[in-house]
Amino acid sequence: MGQVLPLVTRQGDRIAIVSGLRTPFARQATAFHGIPAVDLGKMVVGELLARTEIPAEVIEQLVFGQVVQMPEAPNIAREIVLGTGMNVHTDAYSVSRACATSFQAVANVAESLMAGTIRAGIAGGADSSSVLPIGVSKKLARVLVDVNKARTMSQRLKLFSRLRLRDLMPVPPAVAEYSTGLRMGDTAEQMAKTYGITREQQDALAHRSHQRAAQAWSEGKLKEEVMTAFIPPYKQPLVEDNNIRGNSSLADYAKLRPAFDRKHGTVTAANSTPLTDGAAAVILMTESRAKELGLVPLGYLRSYAFTAIDVWQDMLLGPAWSTPLALERAGLTMGDLTLIDMHEAFAAQTLANIQLLGSERFARDVLGRAHATGEVDESKFNVLGGSIAYGHPFAATGARMITQTLYELRRRGGGFGLVTACAAGGLGAAMVLEAE
């Protein structure tokens, strides 16, 4: 066992997570069509503060993330402060770590708490796949800059004459890695082939995710942590996530064609997480501050770890790399965990990480560790379903997972929970949570 790194303040306070909330998650271009991420962020933070009845001046910092950023609101965190009635003097800044963005936001607030610069803060994230920053070609962008500096009409017309029709076509946000040109689905296909993961295994995991998420909703387990969203023109509220296929069968999954490697692939739209809109946030405090305010925490942040690997081959192995570090820093093993929640970007990616967590060879030859991190107990794993079912608003997923895991730990009488995710750029994140 390596060095244990307790997450406590200088006064010995633990980092308490006192509350968490999210919007329902909606598939791209459905319920939240036309609602930008900044408005989703305002929606969830405003409701979170209203529900907890925490005075606005108590919150000293807000760290928020957005992966698909809009040029008109580059600092989403500050816009949320200004748009929710929070104290205008509240420090606010934005972060981005791809699919692990709200993990990073939580870590940043926790570090401020440990440093003693604040005693309470909010962390979270929001993304919209329905309101996108549609850009222009590089050639058109350059011409427009030059036109702005041109002094005469003839100079402007000469510049415009250089353009061709293709230069005027809109440019949507990139879906591929900047450094490799590979799409996330291409990497998932790599991983399926590398680790021998079949189409049937991927479809089975996706089906399990939807079935468990549907059951969680039907049993009322998510009602406290998901707000009702009222959306213009306010004819019908969104109460639940609208991506969950509770009535699907395995035969339905088998009908879909591969989405990336059309000829030999196994990754489909059904065994991948969909493009999604939504927001999520959590309130963190020092343990003593929560007691002063009479608040009973959902739980505590025990440890966290971030990792990075190469992006050319199987780059979505973040959980396999970050989990052993987070467990080590928490002074725990896989066997000590009550729950394990892993982000399901793709079924192939999820199954590959599960395989490697239990691999002695991977631990020895790749991580340089004496023993495997540990086998994943299916009865503890994604017990309420995962991102394939709920959807994945990139910057919101981590806060969803943290809140969901803490609520479930409390229902089970407490214990330790692991939340972990892969992210674009070969990044990984893992956090160990504790509930009493």
Swiss-Prot record:
Its EC number is 2.3.1.16. InterPro entries: Ac-CoA_C-AcTrfase_FadI (IPR012806), Thiolase (IPR002155), Thiolase-like (IPR016039), Thiolase_acyl_enz_int_AS (IPR020615), Thiolase_AS (IPR020610), Thiolase_C (IPR020617), Thiolase_CS (IPR020613), Thiolase_N (IPR020616). One of its GO terms (molecular function) is acetyl-CoA C-acyltransferase activity. The active site is at C99, H392, C422. Its main location: cytoplasm. PANTHER family: ACETYL-COA ACETYLTRANSFERASE, CYTOSOLIC (PTHR18919:SF107), ACETYL-COA C-ACYLTRANSFERASE (PTHR18919). This is 3-ketoacyl-CoA thiolase. The lineage of its organism: Bacteria, Pseudomonadati, Pseudomonadota, Gammaproteobacteria, Enterobacterales.
